[in-house]
């Protein structure tokens, strides 16, 4: 059984800057990926798979600035959006493909294996390139309402909503 718990994060100013930066990078990667998919769609009438896109994007600066699984999740999200568009298009031929995200939008970032929860802190890994550019090893962010014995943390999604940061953590409960 799985359970999702939402934590309100309390990042320090520097940590908030890094979170903002990483979420902005995810938005830029989403838009780059979307641009390439649309280009292929216009040329061939087909959308490339997530794995084809990964090969095309592996040298992209935005792809390298995110942890690998986080960057892949951005592509999977876009793929799900395109799959939804294809289903809708069968019913309504005027349906539009997924839109580009606005520059100022902060995309959610998802971590699977690159995070740890210790007491009332979430430790998030960053990519090698981000470490080199920003000089940090990881982000350790405090949060409210720590409850122990929830099970094994499997996934963490960081979301910015109405001026506040939240972590949605999915636990596997035995």
Q: Which residues fall in each region the model found?
A:
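Nucleic-acid substrate recognition interfaces
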Residues: 1-174
């Amino acid at each position: 059984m799985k359970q999702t718990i939402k934590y309100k994060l309390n990042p320090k100013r520097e940590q908030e800057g890094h979170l903002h930066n990483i979420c902005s990078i995810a938005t830029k990667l989403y838009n780059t990926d979307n641009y390439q998919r649309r280009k292929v769609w216009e040329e061939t009438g087909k959308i490339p798979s997530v794995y084809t896109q990964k090969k095309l994007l592996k040298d992209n600066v935005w792809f390298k600035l995110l942890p690998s699984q986080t960057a892949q999740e951005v592509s999977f999200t876009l793929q799900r959006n395109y799959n939804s568009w294809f289903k809708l298009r069968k019913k309504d031929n005027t349906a539009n493909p997924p839109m580009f995200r606005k520059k100022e939008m902060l995309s959610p970032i998802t971590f699977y294996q690159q995070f740890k929860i210790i007491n009332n802190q979430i430790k998030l890994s960053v990519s090698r390139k981000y470490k080199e550019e920003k000089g940090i090893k990881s982000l350790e962010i405090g949060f409210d309402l720590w409850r122990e014995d929830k099970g094994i943390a499997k996934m963490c999604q960081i979301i910015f909503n109405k001026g506040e940061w939240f972590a949605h953590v999915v636990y596997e409960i035995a």
